[in-house]
């Protein structure tokens, strides 16, 4: 949950403002832009005493005067090396510091952080919100829950970008919350209910298909995964339609894997760290975070949000290794490993969305393979796709938002590895080689000629991450910022 209630942009003078904490930025070798004269040279004295030069990562804290109780100066580093992602990380440290001081509000001199620039302003707001994120919903003895009621950003800053950054970061925080909730609290039914609620609030059309409808609809691949939970935790296919663009414009489709708990099914996983399999719905969490963001910011583009939500459980009715199922597009699949279930869910959702909505492009998000961790570790999302132009759009947004990703090849030769002796294709490759690529090769069978990029977020969806605005533990809300940037670029 987010512990900042609101971020306000004010034109108040720093000298006249009453605040618990005033935050200033100083570039390496730079000055405080004459602000210190209004604070009786308090800051200059502290800076001199600490031999502070504005070096990146360094900071100085001192007491202020009657109106300004405390003043903190954060080093920005060299001007030419300051990036929007660096600003985002710095802002997250500022809100974390204010939280640790249990302040109800604090103020930031926008000019000293370069917040008249739109990208810096948006990144700063994102960092403030994400740096204050914590998840304490299930602590019976919660630590003193503290909320920063207000952050005031002062001066000539890009107010619209501040507002947009706050909304986007709240979308990321929502995706984090969904991932952090346990599987007994975020079921397919609850996820569907939340999607309906967001859609209704924004005037969007939502359609929820129950598992009882899957076979009649031809969703045989998805149904196979859901069999082990039928009658207990029923699967849902969630579709939300946002029409912000022209009526004649084809929609952009976002598809999420929503396996709310993955035991592996009959091909059951080892017990070690199986609790982490609540995170196997983080692809759908990204789609839900984007749904929330789009509902609030209302970009001028048509978007389809689609989620396949189910558990993957062993049961007397569960799918068996060796079963053959028929997907929505008519392809037959030999299921040789029930723990390679995410691709079976996505196969039907991708082909259904492609058939019913004829999207201009599709992106899918899934914690799909452990192999992507072997290839890229936890530092980057794996990207694979069938269209160079769309892939370049994704890469540009990856660079712009600091959400690192890396393209892996998807050559036709890899399709040979998923050919089956008894069906059209099988749901695993040949042995341990190129697991991420063969999984994407499987998905490619269900997108037709539609431009498509697959995000394998198994390495980036949860766990401790390096940037300061990422959580120390738990769900990261990966892909929300990147994809909203891409949608916005499409509009522009």
Segments from the language model and where they lie:
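Short amphipathic alpha-helical segment within the helicase RecA-like ATPase core
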Residues: 1-258
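A generic structural signal for tightly packed, nonpolar segments enriched in small/aliphatic residues
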Residues: 192-492
